[in-house]
Amino acid sequence: MSQPKTPLRRNGFTFKQFFVAHDRCAMKVGTDGILLGAWAPVAKAQRVLDIGAGSGLLTLMLAQRTEDTVTLDAVELDAQAAEQARENIDASPWAARIQVHSADIQTWTQQQTQRYELIVSNPPYYDKGVACATPAREQARYTTTLDHGTLLACAAQLITEEGFFCVVLPESSGEAFSRLAGEQGWHLRLRTDVAENAGKLPHRVLLAFSPSPGECFCDDLLIRGPDQHYSPAYCALTEAFYLFM
């Protein structure tokens, strides 16, 4: 007799190896974070930092992708989100090598003496606009509490010379962010432009910067093909995570 299927929990997102509750987080699990967590280069990373960790999604994805010797830090300003990230991480297979810090990244950066081979962030990207329903969501969406210049400066203090700082942004914000990064001494090394459907213009961009100069590798990613199914490239990128892929 076949066993009944385990019902999916409804207060978050179930992945193949972990669950992310996000009901106490301003920004929910979404494609942007999943793209960045699956895309960021982890090959040489021994220490990983997630700035603005929210529910802990990126931290958990990168923990799954890295060896057991790799340690990860997740920094989140909002206390409720940081607590939920701790709960998600404690319930995961990688709790022993992850630390969550409820802190302002500028203050936290000044207290650090070690550097990271990989830093990731799914940062706020809207200028101040229409008021959000809650202060926490406004903090997560708008650059008023963490502008891009400050984010880049903090990452510069924490990155190793050969390390990578990776972000996901709207396509419309990518060029301005890259210019600002260049002004602060960063070098763009990886860029992937992401389109939702065949025939559509890119709507997101994945960027990896390094303090060290070098060739920039650029490519494109299509999320869905003409049949509206996930494209082979998107499946290859994310199949280790999506439950039904």
Swiss-Prot record:
Uppermost EC category: transferase
Classification via PROSITE patterns: N6_MTASE
Gene3D superfamilies, alphabetized: Vaccinia Virus protein VP39 (3.40.50.150)
Keyword terms, alphabetized: Cytoplasm, Methyltransferase, S-adenosyl-L-methionine, Transferase, tRNA processing
Keyword tRNA processing applies: yes
Reactions that this protein is recorded to catalyse: adenosine(37) in tRNA1(Val) + S-adenosyl-L-methionine = N(6)-methyladenosine(37) in tRNA1(Val) + S-adenosyl-L-homocysteine + H(+)
EC number: 2.1.1.223
Single GO MF annotation: nucleic acid binding
Biological processes per GO annotation: tRNA processing
Keyword hit for Amino-acid biosynthesis: no
An example Gene Ontology CC term for this record: cytoplasm
Cell compartment(s), UniProt: Cytoplasm
Principal subcellular localisation of the protein: cytoplasm
HAMAP family cross-referenced by the UniProt entry: tRNA_methyltr_YfiC (MF_01872)
Physiological role: Specifically methylates the adenine in position 37 of tRNA(1)(Val) (anticodon cmo5UAC).
Family the entry assigns: Belongs to the methyltransferase superfamily. tRNA (adenine-N(6)-)-methyltransferase family.
Protein name: tRNA1(Val) (adenine(37)-N6)-methyltransferase
Native source species: Cronobacter sakazakii (strain ATCC BAA-894)
Lineage of producing organism: Bacteria, Pseudomonadati, Pseudomonadota, Gammaproteobacteria, Enterobacterales
